[in-house]
Regions:
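A conserved beta-strand-loop-helix scaffold within acyl/acetyltransferase catalytic domains
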Residues: 73-106, 231-274
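Conserved acetyl-CoA-binding loop of GNAT-fold acetyltransferases
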Residues: 143-151, 316-323
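Short hydrophobic alpha-helical segments enriched in small aliphatic residues
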Residues: 4, 10-13, 22
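Short, positively charged and aromatic/hydrophobic N-terminal segments
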Residues: 29, 35, 39-42, 46-53
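Acidic/histidine-enriched, beta-strand-rich ligand/metal-binding domains
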Residues: 103-104, 140, 271-272, 278-281, ...
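Conserved GNAT acetyl-CoA-binding A-motif
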Residues: 124-135, 294-307
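Conserved acetyl-CoA pyrophosphate-binding loop and the N-cap/start of the following alpha-helix
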Residues: 109-120, 278-288
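Short amphipathic alpha-helix that is part of the acyltransferase structural core
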Residues: 50-81, 152, 164-234, 324, ...
Length: 359
């Protein structure tokens, strides 16, 4: 016979077990609810943070800038938009391999302008990039990494009056005819080719601006002979065939000179001006460049040369650029840099900023 006290204890024990089991299952249920609630909160958090991050990137980091790119032939354009409103644009010419020229930059804010230039530099990575800036933009480009170019020229193509010459010089964009930097009087180590006058007397030159008769194997061989080193024949063919303007010089069927230019109809960049060393000193180079430039009537024509070619262009027909800048594709050795670039921070005495001639 079970005592009443024992019965009571057994009932209490069963009740306690039931309560423990109920609490255990309640905890399992609560755990699932909390887990689902946390998952839901994490999902909401991700949505909020992702949208906030997009908003933050636009409003704080990128100032709402969206870039849109357009390409046509040798021309590359990048437009910046903020809330579908155009805030800036930059245009450049590029041959797709080695050379590029930034032509125009417009932006509603200085920061947007800088970002546009950097965006274009990314598109032109691996190429030598030139730009002709106004004097007030020199600091901007030097901050980005450009160096003032010593060997850049703009084609004028006609004899100017004294008043026109003065106006051109006073614009602050060009140097006087025949201007030489003080460092150009220093002897170089012979790494820049300067052609010797040929002793050829009997030859007949034929000029052509047609690509259909061009033998690109001859073009590649001529560039190697004129500038040294080995060149990729495929790249030579691709760049010359896609250039908007070309000029060739032949002695009978032998190619003895060439040049090409990329253009968007308003701006042009002359490239690969070469004359067979056996024919140098006979004005072939000048005739090739002049004939090529005359094809691009009323265009702003830019070219850059090596230090040995400065004297060739530093005369009537061309004007030496005062505010041209270069962003090299690769770091230059100091001796070569001295021939192509001015020291960082260099300013002429008539420029508003303080003259600094230390690198």
């Amino acid at each position: 016979m079970i005592h009443k006290t024992q019965k009571f204890n057994m009932k209490s024990e069963r009740r306690a077990y039931r309560e423990i089991y109920a609490f255990y299952f309640f905890c399992l249920f609560l755990k699932k609810v909390i887990k689902k609630l946390l998952t839901f909160c994490y999902w909401i958090r991700n949505i909020i943070f992702n949208k906030f991050e997009i908003w933050l990137r636009k409003r704080v980091f990128y100032m709402g800038i969206e870039y849109r790119e357009e390409r046509s032939g040798s021309k590359i354009q990048i437009f910046s938009y903020c809330d579908e409103k155009k805030t800036g644009a930059i245009c450049a010419l590029s041959d797709g391999y080695d050379w590029a020229l930034i032509c125009d930059v417009w932006a509603d804010k200085a920061e947007t302008e800088k970002k546009l230039i950097r965006e274009m530099i990314l598109k032109l990575q691996g190429q030598e990039i030139f730009v002709t800036a106004t004097p007030d933009k020199l600091d901007l480009y030097e901050e980005i990494g450009f160096r003032r170019s010593k060997n850049s020229f703009t084609y004028v193509g006609k004899v100017l009056s004294d008043a026109q010459e003065k106006e051109l010089t006073e614009s602050g964009l060009y140097l006087p005819i025949g201007y030489r930097y003080e460092t150009e009087f220093e002897p170089l180590t012979g790494m820049f080719p300067v052609g010797k006058k040929s002793d050829k007397q009997k030859f007949k030159v034929f000029y052509s601006d047609k690509s259909d008769r061009a033998d690109y194997h001859q073009v590649n061989a001529l560039l190697e002979k004129a500038f040294g080193g080995k060149r990729n024949e495929y790249v030579t063919k691709d760049t010359f065939s896609k250039s908007q303007y070309v000029q060739y010089a032949y002695d009978n069927e032998t190619l003895i000179g060439c040049a090409r230019a990329i253009s968007d109809g308003a701006h042009a960049l002359i490239l690969n001006v070469a004359v067979d060393p056996d024919y140098q000193g006979l004005h072939l180079g000048w005739n090739i460049v002049d004939k090529l430039s005359r094809q691009m009537k009323d265009q702003n024509i830019f070219l850059n040369t090596h230090p040995g070619g400065v004297g060739f262009y530093n005369q009537k027909g061309f004007r030496r650029n005062k505010t041209a800048l270069l962003l090299p594709a690769h770091e230059m050795p100091d001796e070569i840099k001295k021939g192509f670039c001015l020291p960082r921070g260099y300013r002429f005495s008539d420029e508003s900023l303080k003259v600094q001639k230390t690198p």
